[in-house]
Amino acid sequence: MAGGSKNSNFYLSGSYYNQDGIIPNTGYEKATFRFNGEQKWRMLTFGANVAYSQANTDKTLTSAGLYGSSGSGTMTGVYRWSPTDDMKHYLNEDGTRYRMFGDRLDVVDERDNPYWILNKNKLKDNTERFTGNFSIKADIADWWWISYRMGIDSYTTDDSKTLAAGGVYKLAWQKGMYSENSYRYKYLSTNLMMNFNKQFGDFNFNLMLGTSTDDTRTWTNYRMAWNFEIPDFYAFDNATNDNRDFSSSRSQKRLIGTFGEFRADWKNTVFLTVSGRNDWSSTLPIENRSYFYPSVSGSIVFTEFLPKIDWLSFGKVRASWARVGKDTSPYSLETALWPSQSFLGGLTGVSNYWTAGNAALKPEITESTELGIELRFFNNRLKLDYAYYTNNSYNQIMSPRLSNATGYILRSVNAGDVYNKGMELSIGGTPIQTKDWTWESTINVSGNRGTVKNLLEGVEILYVTDVQVGNAKAASFPNGNFMAISGSEWKRDDQGRVVLDKNGLPTKGTNANLEIGNREPTFSGGWNNTITYKGLSLNMLWDFRVGGHVYNGTEYAMTLAGVSEFSANREKIEVSGVNTNGEFVTNTFEANKTYTYNGKETSGKTIIALSLIHISEPTRRVVIS
């Protein structure tokens, strides 16, 4: 609904969205309401924008265990389930969970049935969000205006997780687990600006000055209970104090900034922009909380200075340099205390938080440059845009792992400079343009190379996450690739041949943290095409990525479970390499024979199973193309 008059207008809308997920028992539902309005009175213009939404999500754990429970998600369960066993058979007649291996394995070593996860384990969340802003603008003169804007972004997310008793979890959760987490976020901002714009002959000048204030607050309340006294009754009062965990936290951050921008152009042909901003952050030390970052950019439409050329319609060169500052998260300067998880004589105390504070933190600084050219040919039927850029970050704030002797696990520090450089090329045009038909086509190609330098002394590898599959991790190596993969490789001799152990199986190298791959592609891009016939348009987009490595975690998990194509041959396996005597040999293990393994007679079936697991451990490289 919309309406208005000469001096006012408004817009009111509502929407409802409901989608069932591809995975059974999952879905997403969202309702949204929005209002925009504006009223002019003399030299003043008042504006308001308000939006409210509520979203509900039914989810499922797809891949990883929850809270280190040793369980798995639906997709992991699918990958690992035996193809000869009916996956839909997840309940016994008495309602207990069907176990593929019966009582032959501990419950934590069993396979998690995907249908059990979908029907018994419930993950839900509800999010209510309110955003709004109010603005007032005063047009003091045709070349001078002042505006003030105040805004809010507030939302609350409540999520719950229910794990039914008897699943593939750690033993403490065999009688079930239930958790609730409430996260509240509130962001308040104000912005005061004034703008001057004047034309002097062929020159146009624009000056903008302003100040802003940002206030961010969060509240978190978390509750968890497990090992319930009454079966299938998931409530916090149904668990003893030893089987409950409650916690809460809150944070506040404030950022104040002043900024300015000067723009000038001559005959809409030569352009210059200079800007600067200074921020004061509450999350940095007093001596470092003020940081300034400027930028400058310019461009020239050089075809305006050339005689008319039929085949060249437009040409522009551009260049820019910018610096951007960044603060850190709240409470990174001091070491926090939190309640100890251990009790002594019925009493508890406080201990240091696992992340050590650092009162000497500096802001992160990122500097970027760009040189580019834009060309259009044959009356704009063919277009080309090329750019070369650098993007370097200094004094990155990170939290590397510390020695256990320090009493902490992590510490916030300034360490590591990241250097990126790359190119982007876009070629587009209109190959066909008739009265009824139009075909527009654009291809974009880009490539980036990132390296990391100046890591903290003693930090040989920078891990961006603690998550790993097998022995593979996302990592950055000093003076090496920023988006590398770390892992281990086979131990090899001087000729590059795999070294076998006394049992005839491959051995790992002594270094388990080698750079075994680079996640960064050689180049990537897209090809977009739009075909139009008498107002009817069809759009097609192809994305491509060439080069780079990924770790095939899916195949790794399936091989360990014995259900991958790699592990299909269970009757015989051949392993080639150099034995302990330095001789190149090929060892063959057959399922129907007995071998000596670690000094004991062992079935060939066991040897083959161990070999498949052993061989699957090192990272395997996969090139995306």
Q: What does each model-identified segment do?
A:
Residues 286-290:
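Short glycine/threonine-rich loop-to-helix capping motif typified by GTGT followed
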Residues 16-20, 277-282:
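A short, flexible beta-alpha/helix-coil linker loop
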Residues 3-7, 16, 39-43, 198-202, ...:
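A generic beta-sheet turn/junction motif
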Residues 519-551:
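Glycine-rich, aromatic-lined ligand/substrate-binding cores of catalytic
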Residues 1-33, 41-44, 130:
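Outer-membrane beta-barrel translocator/receptor signature
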Residues 22-23, 32-129, 149-256, 283-285, ...:
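Surface-exposed loop/interface segments of Gram-negative outer-membrane beta-barrel transport/assembly proteins
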Residues 1-3, 33-39, 132-138, 192-196, ...:
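Residues on the lipid-exposed face of transmembrane beta-strands in outer-membrane beta-barrel proteins
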Residues 33, 190, 258-262, 270-280, ...:
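Extended, hydrophobic alpha-helical segments in both membrane/secreted and soluble proteins
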